[in-house]
A protein has these predicted regions:
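Bacterial N-terminal signal peptides that target proteins for export
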Residues: 1-9
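Bacterial N-terminal signal peptides
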Residues: 11-20
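Sec-dependent signal peptide cleavage junction
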Residues: 19-29, 448-452, 473-476
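The feature marks non-catalytic terminal segments
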Residues: 29-68, 91-93, 104, 119-121, ...
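Active-site beta-strand->loop->alpha-helix modules in alpha/beta enzyme cores, enriched
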Residues: 32-86, 90-300
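Juxtamembrane low-complexity tails/linkers enriched in Ser/Thr-Pro and polybasic
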Residues: 436-449
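C-terminal membrane-anchoring or membrane-association module
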Residues: 459-480
Length: 480
């Protein structure tokens, strides 16, 4: 009896240890931050960049290293204490025509792919990768930082962005980084993050690189998951508008953007420029013109031949006096743990640290520039009382068509006869073959699901073992 009890106790210990390992692994999969391995990074480049080694490893957005066309750099990590999983690159300017090559320890190329148009590039390294070559082509490149990380959750600003969709439900057009939070800050939290509509933000001007980083941090805070657009016009106020911010040039850029990315609804600035900012005025007037011209095949034949025309259904402007509706900015949003859209917009504005020391503030409905008040300045459908009212739901990027089910065939009835007929035999009909089940990929969700199944089983086994011990102890006591 004592031997049996010892075995059961040993089984309990094993089960408890297994349970703790599974729980620990589950927490590690979801909560473990990636380890910074940048100190192990070796950088090989031309002699003219001797000082670049230290500069590229620092988090200083005001400093960058410029590489000429076809001037490659090679990165490796021979002395790293663990396998790197991510190579992260922060560009000072958007990379154009840059190739990225992964090579194994023998120098054999494993992959070659172009770098996307993002300011922060995250490269997933294959297990066999021993080095990476960054190769600018025709236009060169400017890099401000390179970092190396292990498996895990990457720190800001290396967010898991999705590609900018070519087909959107909405597009917020902001003149500067921070304007999207100050004057249109309820759109992304309410319609994007909370209601699931597909869209992003377009920033018309590109001031300093720091402002770009603040824009990305603020956009992510508001719930944007699709990478924003940067049109890279110069930030000029007020001197220089006549040379660098002409309305016809801005309108042309907007038409090309609308035709390429095809938003159903566009939201932008007050026609009066909120507090009178001349660039805000040009942006709001130009986006209304662009919504109309994007559907005209005679305007800008180049973008028409490349993308075709596009019909924007609605264009809303901040504070526009006609066809107005007011957003509920004080409703708790489940996507943000109960925070309101107003709170989210204000938190997002705080990500623009270079701008928070001034007079700007996200105004509620009682303020001078209430963020919740919009009016439809252009539309091909009636305004209604909400952003997406009167738009055909099948046009939305997030629309999922219902599954078509075949209509049942009408039952055949026999004509009555004077002579009795035999009861027809029941012929079994074959059930339709089920659709093949796709093989699940080993994502983090499927891993978590497997653990969720194993944990109850282990709990049940532990409970059964405890019950067995109690029963045996009770029998021993009864016999004695």
């Amino acid at each position: 009896m004592r031997s049996l009890l010892n075995k059961i106790v040993l089984l309990l210990i094993v089960l408890l240890l297994t349970l703790s390992c599974i729980a620990g692994a589950s927490a590690e999969d979801t909560d473990t931050p990636a380890k910074d391995l940048t100190n192990y990074l070796s950088i090989r480049q031309d002699e003219g960049h001797k000082d670049a080694y230290g500069r590229l490893k620092t988090d200083n957005l005001y400093d960058f290293v410029r590489y000429a066309a076809y001037e490659t750099i090679s990165l490796s990590w021979e002395k790293a204490t663990e396998r790197p999983a991510y190579l992260c690159i922060q560009w000072y300017t958007l990379p154009y025509h840059v190739e990225l090559r992964q090579l194994d320890q023998n120098g054999t190329m494993l992959s070659e792919e172009p770098v996307g148009q993002t300011y922060d590039t995250v490269v997933s390294l294959s297990p066999e990768t021993a080095s990476v070559t960054i190769a600018p082509q025709r236009t060169g490149m400017s890099i401000t930082r390179i970092a190396l990380y292990s498996e895990g959750t990457l720190p800001p600003p290396f967010f898991p962005w999705k590609d900018t969709p070519h087909g959107m439900d909405y597009l917020v057009v902001a003149t500067h980084p921070d304007d999207d939070t100050l004057f249109m800050g309820g759109i992304v939290p309410t319609y994007g993050a909370e209601q699931g509509y597909v869209g992003t933000i377009a920033y018309v001007t590109k001031p300093a690189r720091l402002r770009v980083q603040e824009a990305l941090l603020g956009a992510w805070e508001m719930g944007t998951v699709y990478y924003p657009l940067f049109l890279e016009f110069e930030d000029v106020f007020p001197i220089g508008l006549e040379n660098h911010f002409l309305p016809e040039v801005v309108t042309l850029a907007f038409v090309r953007m609308l035709r390429e990315y095809r938003p159903l609804v566009v939201v932008s600035h007050d026609l009066n420029g909120e507090y009178g900012h001349p660039q805000h005025k040009i942006v709001s007037a130009s986006i209304v013109d662009a919504c109309r011209l994007a559907a005209d095949p005679t305007y800008d034949r180049s973008s028409y031949e490349q993308f075709g025309t596009w019909e924007v259904k609605k264009c809303y402007l901040h504070l526009y006096p006609e066809n107005q509706f007011e957003m509920d900015m004080n409703k708790p949003l489940a996507a943000f743990g109960g925070r309101t859209a107003l709170e989210v917009a204000r938190d997002a504005f705080q990500k623009h640290r270079s701008q928070t020391g001034g007079a700007h503030y996200v105004h509620d409905e009682t303020g001078l520039y209430p963020v919740n008040r919009l009016g439809m300045a252009y539309g091909t459908v009636d305004a209604g009382s909400d952003l997406f009212d009167n738009i055909d739901p099948t046009l939305f990027a997030s629309y999922i068509p219902p599954e078509s089910t075949p209509e049942p065939a009408p039952e055949q009835t026999q004509e009555p006869t004077s002579v009795p007929t035999q009861k027809p035999a029941v012929v079994p009909t074959a059930e339709p073959a089920p659709d093949p089940t796709p093989v699940p990929t080993q994502s983090s969700e499927t891993k978590t699901g497997a653990k969720d199944i194993l944990l109850p089983i282990l709990y049940a086994l532990i409970g059964a073992a405890i019950a067995s011990v109690c029963f045996l102890l009770f029998r021993r006591r009864k016999r004695s």
